[in-house]
């Protein structure tokens, strides 16, 4: 069972429909106990970093996510959810994040040739093969964001070219993040979610 975290800051239903489509049993929940019992967790997110982090903390889900990460279960952060996995953000004001992957969230640089937000389809360049990125080099995914993950290169598994080389996907151990929206990226997005399904089942088998 995959639990999609509901903290009033994410596109939970569209992610749930995508998981239904690939046959991955899932549930939308804000209950810490249900989330802790999941085989894997997806942290969605749209909106502003400070408000999202505040809401996670208010519900005690920041601690829940850290416990899940420490226990080795897979976590996938999507869009703002990916950014929350990092150590901090300077969106509006400095805000501490979950600190599950080293890095800091910064605004995309101003450039007359590149609009902010970065919105629309862009091509992936795979930097490191994982179950989520295999055979996806050169494929297109759908982005909507104004901020990006500035993190060490060793954690960046896919990028897209824009005003800078945007980290499209990041990974550290059992923690994954996608800056783009897999649930809005057609068949390629579904392949990425299938990769998360593979990681989840593999992790579950190894823990039994």
From Swiss-Prot:
One example of a Gene Ontology biological process annotation: L-histidine biosynthetic process
GO molecular function: glutaminase activity; imidazoleglycerol-phosphate synthase activity; lyase activity
Active-site residues per Swiss-Prot or TrEMBL entry: 79, 181, 183
SUPFAM superfamilies noted in UniProt: Class I glutamine amidotransferase-like
Disulfide bonds: none
CDD domains: GATase1_IGP_Synthase
Subcellular location: Cytoplasm
EC id: 4.3.2.10, 3.5.1.2
Amino-acid biosynthesis found in the keyword field: yes
SUBUNIT field: Heterodimer of HisH and HisF.
Listed PANTHER family: IMIDAZOLE GLYCEROL PHOSPHATE SYNTHASE SUBUNIT HISH (PTHR42701:SF1)
Protein name as catalogued: Imidazole glycerol phosphate synthase subunit HisH
Organism: Listeria monocytogenes serovar 1/2a (strain ATCC BAA-679 / EGD-e)
Species lineage: Bacteria, Bacillati, Bacillota, Bacilli, Bacillales
């Amino acid at each position: 069972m995959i639990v999609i975290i509901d903290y009033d800051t994410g596109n939970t239903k569209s992610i749930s429909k995508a998981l239904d489509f690939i046959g991955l049993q899932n549930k939308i929940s804000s209950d810490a106990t249900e989330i802790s019992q999941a085989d894997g967790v997806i942290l969605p997110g749209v909106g502003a970093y400070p408000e999202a982090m505040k809401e996670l903390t208010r519900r005690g889900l920041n601690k829940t996510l850290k416990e899940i990460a420490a226990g080795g279960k897979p976590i996938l952060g999507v869009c703002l959810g990916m950014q929350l996995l990092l150590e901090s953000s300077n969106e509006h004001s400095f805000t501490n994040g979950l600190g599950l992957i080293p890095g800091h969230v910064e605004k995309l640089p101003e450039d007359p040739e590149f609009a902010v937000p970065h919105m629309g389809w862009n091509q992936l360049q795979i930097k490191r093969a994982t179950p989520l990125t295999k055979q996806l080099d050169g494929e297109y995914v759908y982005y909507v964001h104004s901020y990006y993950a500035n993190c060490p290169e060793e954690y960046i598994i896919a990028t897209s070219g824009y005003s800078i080389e945007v980290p499209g996907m990041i990974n550290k151990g059992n923690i994954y993040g996608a800056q783009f929206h897999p649930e809005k990226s057609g068949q390629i997005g579904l392949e990425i979610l299938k990769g998360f399904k593979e990681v989840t089942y593999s992790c579950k088998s190894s823990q039994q």
